[in-house]
Amino acid sequence: MSKVYDWFQERLSIQDIADDITSKYVPPHVNIFYCLGGMTLTCFLVQVATGFAMTFYYRPTVAEAFSSVEYMMTQVNFGWLIRSLHRWSASMMVLMMILHIFRVYLTGGFKKPRELTWITGVILGVLTVSFGVTGYSLPWDQVGYWACKIVTGVPEAIPVVGSSLVELLRGDVSVGQATLTRFYSLHTLVLPVLSLVFMLAHFLMIRKQGISGPL
């Protein structure tokens, strides 16, 4: 093992990287509430793992979406566990995110020079809610269908462009296959990529600026 380590150390200086990570100063006022962001990230990683596993069985069509979820829950080995973990970690992620936002706000973590960290965090919050909205409809049961219809119908109230926005979201004048395809694409590709980009920016800024001091 030492030869393998030395080989990588010679080329990548991995010890310097490890020292930089482990030697970062942590202020004495930090407590368990400062772990809420990390708990949100943990829930996100569970979402990625379980969501990836479910893509092997889920079929994003109005005719087969519900039956594929039913098959996953009743026939696939541990399918019920994977979907349940996905569902409950999604709820936990939203809860941890809300608590994290409150902690940052109440401790003044959004103030100069951490404004951009706060902005990227707010964007990540919007993306998290978007995950919930798009994922809720994917089983295409009665609850998912009507939730999709209501959510995509909200922009109708916007003057002039409301109808166009509704049609853009639905892919048609009414909710159907095009809507499900859009939601599936957003949920499994667009939103994860955007989340990873803003998470990277968020973490790099935290790493650069450190944890905010006490009020």
UniProtKB/Swiss-Prot annotation:
InterPro entries: Cyt_b/b6_N, Cyt_B6_PetB, Cytb/b6-like_sf, Cytochrome_b_N_euk/bac, Di-haem_cyt_TM. Keywords: Chloroplast, Electron transport, Heme, Iron, Membrane, Metal-binding, Photosynthesis, Plastid, Thylakoid, Transmembrane, Transmembrane helix, Transport. It comes from the Eukaryota. The chain crosses the membrane at residues 32-52, 90-110, 116-136, 186-206. Gene3D superfamilies: Cytochrome Bc1 Complex, Chain C. One of its GO terms (molecular function) is electron transporter, transferring electrons within cytochrome b6/f complex of photosystem II activity. One of its GO terms (biological process) is respiratory electron transport chain. It is found in: Plastid, Chloroplast thylakoid membrane. Signal peptide: none annotated. Heme b 2 binds at H86, H187. Heme b 1 binds at H100, H202. Heme c binds at C35. Heme 1 (or BH or b566) is high-potential and absorbs at about 566 nm, and heme 2 (or BL or b562) is low-potential and absorbs at about 562 nm. The 4 large subunits of the cytochrome b6-f complex are cytochrome b6, subunit IV (17 kDa polypeptide, PetD), cytochrome f and the Rieske protein, while the 4 small subunits are PetG, PetL, PetM and PetN. The complex functions as a dimer. Belongs to the cytochrome b family. PetB subfamily. This is Cytochrome b6. The gene is petB.
